[in-house]
Amino acid sequence: MIVSLNEAKKYLRVDYPDEDSIIRKFIHTGETLTVNTLRKPLTNTQINKVAVLYVVAYLFEHREDADMNELTKSLRYILSTEREAAF
């Protein structure tokens, strides 16, 4: 994991343990989406951390109404300089 539970909780401003399980799932989802968007293995860089934290925050805030198309477009934009070209 390139983002720890504590980093994610600090980013989300969550101080209580009640949400730990769901935040861990969001971190895993964020890393998976980041790898899929990058089209290469995940490395521990600042831009990749930002991307994972963006996904975590988006999913945390939009649990009931997450628009995965919007999320994916934003993630592509964030990672555009790192993304492998595909033909």
Predicted region positions:
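Divalent metal-cofactor coordination and adjacent catalytic microenvironments
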Residues: 1-87
